[in-house]
């Protein structure tokens, strides 16, 4: 098949080279963005009297027809035509003739590809924002549903201090809030228009980039044409966002895996989100959580891979940069499924609050509160720490816990203990006493939930603004 760029060559492209360099297998998903960009470019060319109005109308009608064919799955993509840009342009020229050949006037595949990816990433940011908000809502709903449940909090995966289950859920809410904030920067940098940069040096045709910018809804235009076609920072930033949100979901998944074991028995995942064993009939496996954990490393790989690709590239465009797309496309798909299915899992799980409380009643998670009790009586904290440590050791040897001791036992340990010590180190008191701003006391966690709803409202407003920009593109 003759190449649209083949005039300089005397030989056809080797089939192996075609297969190796073709990107149509993955960049076809940018067809809507490519067509929107081409329509805007043709409209601008006609406005500037670079092509005729008749050619513009033929181009736009032809592109509309092609989009309809692709939407219906009726468009035959060709590896020989390399990518989505050439596939569409070749079909357009076949359909409308000479006018189709004028579409590429004042444009290079370098700035064409760049503007497609910018628009695609903008759209992906909207999708990611909506998914984060839904996940945050699931966390708040679950924190409210189990608002009175107390669970062990952990350090080093050893029981440490009691916390409200809702406090634990809201910790993940805060992580996702930061993830949403990262999308702000991704969108800001994706919302810069590269079209008009040409191959690298700009255009001699008297194009109107400001007009094209308006048609495609971009907030600004690249100041430098060389930067415009070589910039992939916004892709790296998206992959960084994706890596961090997957890391947060992976940590949650690891906890859900642990909590759902018989050894913990803190939660039960819904049957709809688990799988069985081909040989062991009793098994209920948290495969979804395990896959989220596994796919996190894959997402990290896309980030590191692109950074490694970019680190040695001279300005401006190099074919290496084709490697930006498979990674970000896969990351978008991976984060989409991970967020949506985690939201469903959180909403569907059952929390075994009575068992969590029983675990706390049978261990030493209240030891810090016992030391705090002494410190508030004037005992230096380090001395109080030593006293309580000895008491814990004594209980371990006797096969009991601190709550099993009598007031007389406590007074024998230290004359600073009074009759109120057992109330002071009850599990409920341990939680209620931590009523500082970011603490786990019920009123603090309620404030976190209420603030979370305010944050979600602000995030939804931001998504609406993003959507307005994305949907302003004239197709």
Locations of the language-model features?
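Glycine-rich cofactor/substrate-binding loops
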Residues: 1-37, 98-99, 282-475
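Conserved hydrophobic residue
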Residues: 50-51, 75, 264-265, 380, ...
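Short, well-ordered beta-strand elements within core beta-sheets of diverse protein domains
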Residues: 43-51, 120, 164-167, 236-244, ...
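Alpha-helical coiled-coil oligomerization motifs
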Residues: 140, 144-147, 188-191, 257, ...
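Charged, flexible cofactor/metal-binding loops and thiol motifs
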Residues: 117-125, 129, 144, 152, ...
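A helix-coil-helix interface module used to build multimeric assemblies
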Residues: 1-202, 207-211, 275-276, 287, ...
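Generic, well-ordered alpha-helical scaffold segments in large soluble proteins
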Residues: 41, 62-69, 91, 95, ...
């Amino acid at each position: 098949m003759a190449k649209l760029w083949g005039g300089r060559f005397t030989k056809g492209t080797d089939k192996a080279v075609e297969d190796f360099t073709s990107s149509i297998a993955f960049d076809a998903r940018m067809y809507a963005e490519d067509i929107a960009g081409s329509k805007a470019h043709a409209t601008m060319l006609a406005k500037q009297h670079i092509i005729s109005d008749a050619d513009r109308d033929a181009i736009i009608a032809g592109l509309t027809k092609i989009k309809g064919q692709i939407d219906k799955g009726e468009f035959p993509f060709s590896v020989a035509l390399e990518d989505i840009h050439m596939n569409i342009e070749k079909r357009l020229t076949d359909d409308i003739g000479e006018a189709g050949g004028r579409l590429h006037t004042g444009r290079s595949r370098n700035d064409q590809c760049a503007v497609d990816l910018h628009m695609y990433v903008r759209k992906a940011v909207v999708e990611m924002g909506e998914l984060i908000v839904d996940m945050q809502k699931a966390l708040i709903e679950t924190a409210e549903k189990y608002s009175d449940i107390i669970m062990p909090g952990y350090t080093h995966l050893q029981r440490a201090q009691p916390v409200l289950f809702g406090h634990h859920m809201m910790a993940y809410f805060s992580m996702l809030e930061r993830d949403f904030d990262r999308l702000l920067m991704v969108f800001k940098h994706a919302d810069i228009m590269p079209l008009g940069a040409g191959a690298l040096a700009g255009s001699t045709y008297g194009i109107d980039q400001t007009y094209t910018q308006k048609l495609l809804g971009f907030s600004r235009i690249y100041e430098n044409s060389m930067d415009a076609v070589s910039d992939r920072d916004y892709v790296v930033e998206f992959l960084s966002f994706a890596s961090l949100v997957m890391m947060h979901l992976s940590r949650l998944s690891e906890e859900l895996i642990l909590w759902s074991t018989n050894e913990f028995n803190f939660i039960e995942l819904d049957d709809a989100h688990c799988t069985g064993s081909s040989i062991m009939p009793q098994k209920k496996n948290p495969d979804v959580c395990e896959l989220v954990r596994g796919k996190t490393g894959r997402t990290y790989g896309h980030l590191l891979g692109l950074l490694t690709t970019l680190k040695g590239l001279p300005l401006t465009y190099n074919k290496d940069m084709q490697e930006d797309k498979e990674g970000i496309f896969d990351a978008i798909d991976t984060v989409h499924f991970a967020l949506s299915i985690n939201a469903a899992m959180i909403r569907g799980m059952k929390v075994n609050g009575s068992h969590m409380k029983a675990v706390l009643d049978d261990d030493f998670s209240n030891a810090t509160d016992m030391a705090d009790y002494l410190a508030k009586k004037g005992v230096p904290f380090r001395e109080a720490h030593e006293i309580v440590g000895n008491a814990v050791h004594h209980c371990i040897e006797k096969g009991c816990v601190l709550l099993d001791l009598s007031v007389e036992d406590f007074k024998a340990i230290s004359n600073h203990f009074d009759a109120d010590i057992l109330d002071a180190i009850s599990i409920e008191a341990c939680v209620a006493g931590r009523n500082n701003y970011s603490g786990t006391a019920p009123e603090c966690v309620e404030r976190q939930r209420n603030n979370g709803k305010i944050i979600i409202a602000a995030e939804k407003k931001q998504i609406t603004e993003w959507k307005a920009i994305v949907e302003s593109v004239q197709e």
